[in-house]
């Protein structure tokens, strides 16, 4: 896999949550090829090991580069697990310079079955009135808290260095609500608001915070 840019990230450490997924593993690969030491975070140890091995092999085959990509298993909505991963990553790869918050997703119980209500009340299991409150909380937690908590854990060293980059993953639903996906859109809107807040909050500390709408 070719990377369509060439920047020097030698000496930098990048942490990518959701790093074993399709989108974020590609981001991790690009960072590694550009010279960063990359920690990918996810919950499935076997998948993390498989993705780390594949990215390392792909970089060697495509660029003849020996890159560093390592997997770390933890739950991004569990601050204790994140803190433990932070300590391990710092000891093995160095303190975080780049944080990509890619963990996220949606659940069927938090999606309506129709786009627009056509009658007084819709009786589907997935009508607005029957949405599962636990699944809505799960979507909000994974997307929003799963972005906020890694930032709390991994940015303290950035403040000390007065340098760092945070990349959150927003969505078109952050600014333009899509039908059916109520909880996901709410969460992505919150992420965009959080990103703007952090950009101001960290503005004089040398830390950048951005959110592409993917």
Regions found by a protein language model. Name each.
Residues 177-185, 197-199:
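Active-site loop-to-helix junction immediately N-terminal to the catalytic Tyr of the SDR YXXXK motif
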Residues 20-21:
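Conserved glycine-rich cofactor-binding loop
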Residues 171:
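Residue(s) in the substrate-gating loop at a strand-loop-helix junction
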Residues 109-128, 132-137:
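Substrate-binding pocket helix/loop in short-chain dehydrogenase/reductase
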């Amino acid at each position: 896999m070719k990377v369509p840019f060439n920047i020097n990230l030698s000496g930098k450490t990048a942490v990518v949550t959701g790093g074993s997924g399709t989108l974020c593993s590609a981001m991790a690969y690009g960072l590694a090829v550009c010279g960063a030491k990359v920690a990918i975070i996810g919950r499935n140890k076997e998948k993390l090991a498989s993705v780390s091995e594949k990215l390392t092999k792909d970089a060697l085959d495509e660029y003849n580069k020996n890159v560093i990509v390592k997997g770390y298993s933890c739950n991004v909505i569990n601050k204790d697990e994140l803190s433990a991963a932070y300590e391990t990553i710092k000891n093995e790869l160095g303190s975080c310079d780049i944080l990509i918050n890619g963990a996220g997703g949606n659940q069927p119980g938090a999606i309506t079955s129709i786009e627009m209500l056509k009658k007084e009340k819709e009786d589907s299991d997935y009508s607005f009135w029957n949405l599962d409150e636990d699944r809505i909380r799960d979507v909000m937690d994974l997307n929003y808290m799963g972005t906020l908590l890694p930032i709390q854990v991994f940015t303290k060293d950035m403040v000390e260095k007065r340098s760092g980059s945070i990349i959150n993953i927003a969505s078109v639903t952050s600014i333009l609500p899509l039908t059916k996906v109520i909880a996901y859109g709410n969460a992505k809107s919150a992420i965009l608001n959080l990103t703007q807040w952090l950009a101001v909050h960290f503005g004089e500390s040398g830390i950048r915070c951005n959110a592409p709408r993917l």
